[in-house]
């Protein structure tokens, strides 16, 4: 179920402060965050945010199509390496 409109978007306060500071200074350095639950707001457009996926920080360049989605959607946590092949059937 989606979040109620009367509540507004959720964004962690420490991340919001980092975004505002980066917008004021005009820095292009990636902003590191562990907050996958924060929603992307229009102030973040054009910034690179390094989102933690449990192992490393994945750089995410924010565009206008991403507004309204969560940061964690762009940093996958699981790697799929494919199913192992059955060696018995390959020999035939």
UniProtKB/Swiss-Prot annotation:
PROSITE patterns with a match to the protein in the record: RIBOSOMAL_S19
Keywords assigned by UniProt, alphabetized: Ribonucleoprotein, Ribosomal protein, RNA-binding, rRNA-binding
One of the record's GO cellular component terms: cytoplasm
Coiled coil: none
MF GO annotations: rRNA binding; structural constituent of ribosome
GO BP annotations listed: ribosomal small subunit assembly; translation
InterPro entries the record matches: Ribosomal_uS19, Ribosomal_uS19_bac-type, Ribosomal_uS19_CS, Ribosomal_uS19_SF
Family note: Belongs to the universal ribosomal protein uS19 family.
Record protein name field: Small ribosomal subunit protein uS19
Species name: Psychromonas ingrahamii (strain DSM 17664 / CCUG 51855 / 37)
